[in-house]
Regions:
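Bacterial N-terminal signal peptides
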Residues: 5-14
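Sec/Tat signal peptide C-region and signal peptidase I cleavage site
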Residues: 14-20
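Short, glycine-/small- and polar/acidic-enriched structural segments
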Residues: 21-164, 168-173, 187, 191-197, ...
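Short, surface-exposed acidic
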Residues: 56-62, 162-169, 270-281, 311-317
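Solvent-exposed, polar/charged alpha-helical surfaces in well-ordered, non-transmembrane soluble domains
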Residues: 70, 74, 78, 92, ...
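Pocket-lining segment of extracytoplasmic ligand-binding domains
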Residues: 160, 166-168, 172-268
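Secondary-structure end/capping motifs
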Residues: 235-311
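Conserved C-terminal helix/tail region of periplasmic/extracytoplasmic solute-binding proteins
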Residues: 304-331
Length: 331
């Protein structure tokens, strides 16, 4: 009798262990306004709330800030973080790298659409054709960031695919806050910046700075910010993952109509002295959208595959994302 009792207890323990999910979710975020859902989730404890509703109480959520996709993707692969955010190229690069492996990476959802601007204080530069060897362009990460890829897409459009990297030699990596400070100083050794909101708007406050390139001229309305994770996290934590989707949906629904409150969260999290009224003016541009539906992902994928940036071409946007959002009308 005791044998059967011990066996039953053992089986119950195994069942409980199989149901066990993470007690902590570690997020990686960036400086941009492209991930405002993260700020809402953080301040309103949305993931914790939805996890508790699904039977995972006392979930701990932590947040770390990164500049650019390389370090975040390395952290995700090493297991140092669970969920990351970034531009489309960062997701595509890691999706292709892990495609067919035991731990593939896919998108959780899109987060935003927003215009990204290449600006300069060189009055002779009106289009990308005017850049010369004396110009230097700061962007979050050379070759791999969304800005670097957009510059390559613009070069391919201007000079053909064979010269897609024609302007790469002018670029170097610098965080958006530091590139803004340097550009506005006028003596930092570079004269152009391809950045993110709200920093590009801060740069354009200087009358000596003007726009050279708008990302919408290259891709049209397209997803800019995404969030992604590995199979290791997705598969082992079905309830936490379901809570994450619910939290993202609630945060996305909150932003319209609560812009100032949302931007107050962002200003606090960025640890920079930013005027919320100024940030709210940026969002008056209707091209800023905080939606989970992926859009124009295949435009990015086609370019990166055509130029050898990724070795695998997705058949559709659904290949790039976990199934929980496949009911959306994405592209």
């Amino acid at each position: 009798m005791r044998f059967w009792a011990l066996l039953l207890a053992s089986l119950c323990g195994l069942t409980a262990a199989a149901r066990a999910e993470v007690s902590e979710v570690r997020f990686a975020q960036q400086f941009s306004m492209g991930y405002l859902q993260y700020n809402v989730m953080k301040h309103q404890n949305l993931l914790e709330k939805h996890a508790a509703l699904l039977g995972v109480p006392n979930l701990k959520v932590t947040w770390a800030v990164f500049n650019g996709p390389d370090m975040m993707n390395d952290a995700l692969l090493s297991g140092s973080v669970d969920v990351v955010c970034g531009g489309v190229p960062g997701l595509l690069t890691l999706w292709a790298k892990t495609h067919g492996t035991a731990n593939p990476v896919r998108g959780i959802a899109a987060l935003s659409q927003q215009p990204v601007l290449l600006v300069t204080r060189n009055p002779a530069v009106k289009t990308i054709r005017d850049f010369g060897p004396g110009d230097r362009i700061a962007l979050p990460a050379v070759k791999v960031s969304a800005q670097a890829t957009l510059l390559q897409m613009a070069a391919a459009k201007e000079w053909g695919d064979a010269q897609y990297d024609r302007l790469d030699s002018l670029t170097f990596s610098l965080s958006p806050p530091d590139s803004t400070t340097g550009l506005l100083s006028g003596n930092a050794g570079f004269n152009s910046v391809f950045s993110v909101p709200p920093f590009q708007s801060l740069q354009l406050r200087d009358p000596a700075v003007h726009v050279v390139l708008d990302s919408h001229d290259i891709t049209g309305p397209a997803t800019g910010g995404n969030t992604w994770t590995s199979a290791r996290f997705h598969d082992a934590n079905p309830r936490v993952y379901q809570a994450l989707i619910a939290a993202l949906k609630e945060a996305s629904a909150f932003i319209p109509g609560h812009e100032r409150e949302t931007l107050g969260y962002y200003a606090e999290d960025s640890k920079m002295k930013m005027d919320v009224a100024f940030l709210a003016q940026i969002l008056e541009d209707k091209r800023y959208k905080y939606v989970l539906k992926p859009e124009a992902m295949m435009t990015w994928a086609s370019f990166m595959h055509r130029t050898g940036r990724i070795k695998v071409m997705p058949a559709s946007w659904k290949d790039l994302f976990w199934p929980e959002i496949h009911d959306m009308d994405g592209s």
